[in-house]
Every structure is written in structure tokens, then in C-alpha cells.
Amino acid sequence: MARGQQKIQSQQKNAKKQAEQKKKQGHDQKAAAKAALIYTCTVCRTQMPDPKTFKQHFESKHPKTPLPPELADVQA
């Protein structure tokens, strides 16, 4: 019967240790990366992190489409 009690205590200790480790780890990389993608291409709906990348994408992928007004003053 003693082993059953030890097992329960060990599981609780391990769960506490795992929770502390997860808390210490910080944030989710995937969520942070998704939050950084704030510019969306109006033609193909691709998301980009900054206006410079957005302008480069637009000029290379959609050369015949006129540049959106938010990209007019951005230097690539």
C-alpha cells in the first residue's frame, strides 16, 4: 500500500515541477509570430511583418497591380 501513496505523491510533485517549468518557459512562439504579421496583401492575402517586406512582396509578386496608398511612401 505504501507504493500507491508514494506514486500519488510523485505524480503531484512531477505535475508541480512541470507547471513551474512551463511558467518559466514564457510565451508561445507560434502566437508571437502570428501577432507580428500585421500587414496583409490585398491581392493574395499573404501576411507580412513590416511595410518594407510588404512593398518588396507587392513589387515582385504583383507588378501590374497599382501600389496601395499605404505603401506609396515606404522605401524598400
From Swiss-Prot:
One BP term from GO: negative regulation of DNA-templated transcription
Compositional bias segments (type: Low complexity): 1-13
Domain of life: Eukaryota
Molecular-function GO terms, alphabetical: zinc ion binding
GO cellular component, one term: cytoplasm
Region ranges (Disordered): 1-32, 53-76
Stretches with biased composition (Basic and acidic residues): 17-31, 53-62
Keywords per UniProt: Cytoplasm, Metal-binding, Nucleus, Repressor, Translation regulation, Zinc, Zinc-finger
Its biological purpose: Transcription repressor involved in the exit of embryonic stem cells (ESCs) from self-renewal.
Protein name, per record: Zinc finger protein 706
Organism: Gallus gallus
